[in-house]
A protein has these predicted regions:
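Terminal-region recognition feature
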Residues: 1-332
Length: 332
């Protein structure tokens, strides 16, 4: 299995980040006999990239349109590395991909959190390594507080409001609660309930329609699994890592990345090449197919669509340093 440092060793002139990444994407497609799309973002590397650049957004639909163009197969391997983002943007992506592909296998080389996990639920199966993880899908809200913007779980807002109702029956408790309650805008509680319901519905519908298709009581099984993934009270933190064993125990259809050594080598080579691209170029999000068509979002928000030119390769460091793998929060 190639390491990050071994792939870094290939990043020497005349090679470019694009040529190395695309070499392994092409080899991967040849090995699996399916179309391959990479969706990877710079979310596990320390940076000052704005969250909306690395999150799943409506703009990503354009990226997928770019890379789906010209693909002939009806089967897709989607390599996914994402902190999550907008559930409704994720829904748009799923609807688009499912118009084209009858079978989608989602390969997670490291992490797919939140709405990224929701996207995996739209696959027929999920490929995870020993080190791979998914996460809870409970929705989050960004609230403006006296301490600045904070990302707060929707369920925590609802629970806190119920706590306030109970404690404020004693009017002596109104004083401490007023600054907290004043931060809640009009309609927030309804929005929280709707967001939770939407996450459950989207994940449940996709699981029933695709992953559990043909199984007995598929809808019931999918509904229970979706509710579990969206249960903030169960996981306590939106950033919890659900391992391969955790996901299999929940009932997700999981394939082991290590079952096919060539597949593992190629997937991780693509993944390492993408993370090194993020380290050595301004790229912060890459949507790319095995034919070299790409939609690249730079850290400054600039987009580079269609057969993106090779990004310049700076002088490679003499001593490889493993990039940090700390996760970042997402909207859902």
């Amino acid at each position: 299995m190639p390491t990050w440092g071994e792939i870094l060793g290939e990043f020497q002139p005349p090679n470019t980040p694009d040529s190395i990444r695309r070499k392994y994407l092409s080899q991967l497609a040849s090995h699996v006999g399916r179309d391959v799309i990479l969706y990877s973002t710079k979310w596990t590397d320390p940076s000052n990239v704005p969250p909306d650049v690395i999150s799943i957004t409506e703009e990503d639909v354009q990226g997928f349109m770019e890379v789906v163009h010209g693909l002939k197969n009806d089967k897709l391997d989607l390599i996914l590395h994402s902190p999550g983002g907008s559930p409704v943007a994720t829904e748009a992506i799923v609807k688009y991909l499912r118009k084209k592909f009858t079978h989608i296998r989602v390969v997670v080389p490291q992490g797919a959190m939140s709405a990224g996990t929701m996207l995996t639920c739209a696959g027929n199966s999920i490929v995870l390594g020993k080190h791979s993880f998914l996460g809870p899908i409970d929705p989050q809200f960004i609230l403006q507080t006296q301490l600045g913007n904070r990302m707060v779980p929707a369920q925590a807002i609802l629970d806190e409001f119920e706590m306030a109702k109970s404690e404020c029956k004693d009017t002596h408790n109104l004083g401490p609660w007023l600054p907290i309650l004043s931060q809640y805008g009009p309609g927030l509680l309804i929005e929280c309930k709707n967001a939770i319901a939407l996450s459950r519905k989207l994940a449940g519908d996709w699981l029933a329609q695709y992953m559990f298709s043909g199984q007995k009581r598929a809808t019931h099984k999918a509904s229970i699994l979706a509710r579990t993934l969206a249960d903030h009270k169960k996981y306590k933190s939106h950033g919890r890592h659900l391992s391969r064993d955790d996901c299999r125990q929940l009932g997700l259809v999981i394939e082991d990345l290590e079952q096919d050594q060539i597949l593992q080598d190629l997937v991780l080579s693509v993944f390492h090449a993408s993370t090194i691209t993020f380290n050595q170029t301004p790229a912060a999000k890459i949507i790319e197919n095995h034919n070299g068509r790409a939609f690249v979002k730079l850290s400054g928000g600039i987009r580079l669509p269609v057969q993106v030119q090779n990004l310049p390769l700076p002088q490679a460091p003499k001593i490889p340093v493993q990039p940090s793998q700390a996760p970042a929060p997402a909207l859902s």
